[in-house]
Amino acid sequence: RELETWLAVDLSASLDFGTAECDKRELAIAACAAVAHLTRGGGNRVGAVVSTGAQTLRIPARGGLPHARAMVRRVAELPRAAEGERGDLAAILETLRRPPRRRGLVVVISDFLGARSGEVFEWERPLRGLSARHDLIGIEVLDPRDLELPDMGTVVLADPETGRQKEVVTTPLLRREFAAAAAAHRDDVASALRRCGAAQLTLR
């Protein structure tokens, strides 16, 4: 009771990708709705910090069903990021660190495809800082094509956050290397979340 929950939501350009029934952005918004529903009531409050890279939306923590519904609607209506606009999950988390907030729950919703500084993800330090005052959950949002490439012959791969494109031939070797790199990245994300004291859920 009287739990304060904060959603840290990454809606950068890489989330505007999807090859399944919905894109990753839609999965992220569904995760927002689920957390808001599960944590409301009993004097609990929920708020959010959402960023596309170009625009940041801050929604104060409040209680009640009307607030939860309005919050999810505002997140869903946030304009999509422009191609070439980089996201910054670390900046979202820093926003939650300062000023210090009452002890509660922080739920981070992202595909965790952000940049690294050496072997460390740039979002690790601010997330570790949040762990001193909050319980943490990381919700990793994935598309099947984040994990493996289909056999499609010649395709153009694009990075939505830089705008860079590259034409490749999806040979068996390339597909194996892509799958191995994707699996290694997911293992690194899981290890980083554990180091920060965060539980992990995966949506795909």
Please state what every model-predicted region is.
Residues R1-A33, H37-R204:
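Exposed, interaction-prone extracellular/peripheral surfaces
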